[in-house]
Amino acid sequence: MGKNVKTLIWGFGAMGSGMASILLEKGGYELVSVIDTHPQKAGKDVGELLGRAPLGVKVTMDHLKAFGSHPDVALIATSSFVEEVSPQIEFALENDANVITIAEEMSYPWIDSKEIAERLDALALNRGKTVLGTGINPGFVLDTLVVSLSGVCKEVRHIHAKRVNDLAPFGPTVMRTQGVGTTPEKFEEGIRSGNIVGHIGFRQSIMLIAKALGWTIEDIVEERQPIITNVRRKTNYVDVTPGNVAGCRHTARAYSCGREVIFLEHPQQVCPEAEGVRTGDYVVIDGDPPVNLRIEPEIPGGTGTMAMAVNMIPLVVNAPPGLLTMIDLPVPRSISNGF
């Protein structure tokens, strides 16, 4: 084994702090810097914030100071959107760090932010570094996993993938973006205004699958519908009464050569078991041979995202430079001791 990989974490919320804990549990890594804009975290020891012994690494709001530790890789967990994370990615690249971000739109940024994607790719190539967007979804369940399963097929005609999860552990921000707790009328208003977005990443997952399978996508049609509860559903953050919205049923259909080739579903709601709905991840490939995969319950989104980001570090550090996707890299795997 070579020297430890010096790692910086940008964004020390639930995901960033979870990544830090995973890094500290594995060998082969050295957590050298943490950046966060929350004033109550700034200046505090990372170990103490994690409920551990002091590490001698303090959270800072000073980006330049943080990168003075010369990290090999920066894990960015600050936003879902390309426009918001691209300045952070550029700063990391300019300071000679590889980048792994869990921003959903960065899993395939060319589809909605082509100019930014091309700029990031050019900068990464110029600096000899690698940039990757990943996570549980997009990044795995509705794209990388699907692509891997297609490898046993002589032919693929249609793909149907679905993720059913429980939003109960999530906080107010997620509840608002999914419309949880609103009336059906307010849900429709939120869809029109853009305040209720449903799942972020369908378009990116579709393009990852299409690129891997050599399909040309002509159109993507998305639909968002409210999931109305018939029973009371209560979490630590929201109390949903019968007749109101417990979540968002978001779907996306992709067309090639005039026919549907990909159908993705992601109904997200609080306490689905309250009405007999089982959580799970499902992939059905109409191919030769056909493939039907069921994972129940669903792969936990939080843990899965944190683990995927950390587990991709060795693959990214050893990858060719540029802005890459999950289908450009070897199969993800859990590496117990760094490299």
Curated annotation (Swiss-Prot):
Gene3D superfamilies noted in UniProt: NAD(P)-binding Rossmann-like Domain
Keyword NAD attributed: yes
Catalytic activity: (2R,4S)-2,4-diaminopentanoate + NAD(+) + H2O = (2R)-2-amino-4-oxopentanoate + NH4(+) + NADH + H(+)
BP-aspect Gene Ontology terms: lysine biosynthetic process via diaminopimelate; ornithine metabolic process
Complexes and interactors: Homodimer.
Function recorded in the entry: Involved in the ornithine fermentation pathway. Catalyzes the oxidative deamination of (2R,4S)-2,4-diaminopentanoate ((2R,4S)-DAP) to yield 2-amino-4-ketopentanoate (AKP). Although Ord is more efficient with (2R,4S)-DAP, the diastereoisomer (2R,4R)-DAP can also be metabolized. Ord is specific for NAD as hydrogen acceptor.
Designated name of the protein: 2,4-diaminopentanoate dehydrogenase
Originating organism: Unknown prokaryotic organism
Gene: ord
